[in-house]
Structures are given as structure tokens and as C-alpha cells.
Curated annotation (Swiss-Prot):
Gene3D superfamilies in alphabetical order: 3.90.940.10
GO molecular-function terms, A-Z: DNA binding; DNA-directed RNA polymerase activity
GO CC terms of this entry: DNA-directed RNA polymerase complex
UniProt similarity note: Belongs to the RNA polymerase subunit omega family.
First-level EC class: transferase
Example GO biological process: DNA-templated transcription
EC numbers: 2.7.7.6
Role this protein plays: Promotes RNA polymerase assembly. Latches the N- and C-terminal regions of the beta' subunit thereby facilitating its interaction with the beta and alpha subunits.
Protein name: DNA-directed RNA polymerase subunit omega
Entry-linked HAMAP family: RNApol_bact_RpoZ
Gene (name only): rpoZ
Reaction catalyzed: RNA(n) + a ribonucleoside 5'-triphosphate = RNA(n+1) + diphosphate
Length: 72
């Protein structure tokens, strides 16, 4: 399943390349938990879905000011 994820577009929104996998993993975990609560047992690629949501701006980086201060 290729969702056509453009990592450069994600980098423009998140700035820090090491934050992107953390955000995607947390969102993927949330998506999986939501599906389990709904009783959906279908296998999905939750990380790809989360990366696509990040690319499309559906999820955003919280505390970007804190990240900026830590990087200095």
C-alpha cells in the first residue's frame, strides 16, 4: 500500500526530522486503539495513515515553541 507520502512536505510543517516519527507513532497508536474500541479487526498500516494525516495538516506539532527553545 503506497499512500504517496511526501516527507519533504512533512518536514516543512514539523521542522525537526526526529519529531516526525514520534508524532506518527503516537497517532498510529491512537488510531489502532480507536479501531479496537469500535471492534474493527481489519489490519491497516496505521503509521502510513498517520504520516499522511501529518502531511495533509490534520495533525500538528504541539509545543513547537518548546522544541525551538530546546534546539538552541
Amino acid at each position: 500500500m503506497n499512500l504517496g507520502i511526501n516527507y519533504d512536505r512533512i518536514l516543512n510543517k514539523a521542522k525537526y526530522k526526529y519529531v516526525i516519527p514520534i508524532i506518527a507513532a503516537k497517532r498510529a497508536e491512537t488510531l489502532k486503539n480507536l479501531d479496537e474500541l469500535k471492534g474493527i479487526t481489519e489490519k491497516k498500516d496505521y503509521v502510513s495513515i498517520a504520516l499522511k494525516e501529518l502531511e495533509n495538516g490534520k495533525i500538528q506539532v504541539k509545543n513547537s515553541a518548546l522544541l525551538d527553545s530546546l534546539s538552541k
